[in-house]
Amino acid sequence: MPPLTGQDLVDAGWQPGPKFPALLAAAAAYEERGIHDPAYLVKLLERDFGKEDPKIRLRDEAIPFSEAIKATCALDEKNIAGVRRFMSQLLRTPVIEAGAVMPDACPAGSAEATIPVGGAIAVKNAILPTAHSADICCSMFATVFQGESTTAKMLDALMDSTRFGFGGRPEEDRVDHPVLRESIWSNPFLNGLEEHAARHLADQGDGNHFASLGKLRVTRAFIESLGSAGHDDIARALHDAVTGHIDETDGVTFYTLVTHHGSRGLGAQLYTRGHKAAIRETNRIATGIPPAAAWLDVTTDAGADYWEALQYVGRWTRANHELIHSRFLERTAARAVTNFGNEHNFVWKRGETFLHGKGATPAWKDDDGRPLLGLIPLNMAAPILVTLGRDNEEFLSFAPHGAGRNQSRTATLRDFRKANGESDDRAVARAIADATRGLDIRWYYGKGDLTESPVGYKPAAQVRAQIEYFGLADVVAEVTPLGCIMAGDGGPQPWRRQDHLTPKQKRQIEHRADRRKDRQSLRHRETREDDAD
């Protein structure tokens, strides 16, 4: 007869938590003495430990949380008030031990206890799916490379190397990778999702996801910072690439490709399954818990399976970044010098604590004592910050993941409407052009998205200053932008009307987007100038 498991204890009415290891150890001791009947084992454990009220409840008051954010204007104050309200709701959840908000924090929805963007929590032996969001493993990845082409030509190649927008790659255009053949698909949270994994490789989606081309100035100080922090491989690769070309002040400039995206449809499906399971399991052992605060205990089978599924999605997302970068390097005949990256929508295990970040960059020290290397984009016209974490435990050792917003996308667009309520497309185009002057900005759909331009975000300088003020990370280098590709404005959100579209209509939408993309590339080819460094 198999030994008693954590799931058996849950089924018998115990609430998952710190007591579980002792319960399982006691059960194992009885089993060594020859007692194997599950019902009798449960009775013995009830005698030894007592039965708890199986219904867990919210705390009467929220536990305190730290704020690495300060207001500089009225919009900031209103935004921070909303962040505090939602964090206070969330931190009544009994399994959460600590919380923090970053300089880019902003509310992420209206449902009770919804963790804000820029929010982080520490949880004992449990995972809250909403606290990593549906865009699981949204992350950054950078490749420093040597190339001889122009910005325009490289962006043309980048446009061909990736894909943006709704949907995924058609079967004839898919990209293979060994990550698709891992023996993982029997996991109940991943079973049947092979198609989502296959169709979204070399695909970045929409919203704030991007592929950015820039320049990284490699100085002696930067290399020494990396070496001192223990990132020897990266420091050595950069040192070898600049040997004979570097001086004490200016350094050497390299092109750098930076991509930002999550796990696409694969992660969205996993999130839906995980959140449903969390609500189901939480309702079985607790009462009065808002759906956004539902959790999966990692000592149960469901929690362990979900954790395993998250790790796979992390590997899949890293493979997706690497595929896009390798396709780009092949098309441009460029040579990679080094690469690095980080997640900012994920769950990380440190001992028995599961750190959740929804738009928060890990900034602690790894198991070897090295400050984590991070990439923090602020907007498409501002430098992407290369950081080393300061491991500031007051703020759960996180840093921001971007600039954040002070108002919703809808509110941003409201200022660019005509008297009749229609969008003033000319005013939108002017605002985007003014905010990105001198940069080669491409929109996959052919039409710009104002809310993803610098107009839609907090001032970059403000967020950067607060990173330093609160001691979250050290900025050791910058990737200065040359150009960027984003999905752009594809019209009404397709996933809200997809059920009403025929396959032919869906193909027509994609074909129109392709034609706009081709026209845009043609215009850039006609006007490009050689700007290689």
Could you say what each language-model-derived stretch is?
Residues 69, 84-86, 94-101, 107-117, ...:
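Domain-length cofactor-binding catalytic modules of enzymes
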Residues 78-79:
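A beta-strand/beta-hairpin structural motif
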Residues 21-24, 39-43, 169-173, 476-481:
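Short coil/turn segments at secondary-structure boundaries
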Residues 45-75:
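Low-complexity, highly charged intrinsically disordered N-terminal segments
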Residues 145-147:
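Acidic, low-complexity central loop/insert segments
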Residues 142:
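N-terminal glycine-rich flavin-associated loop
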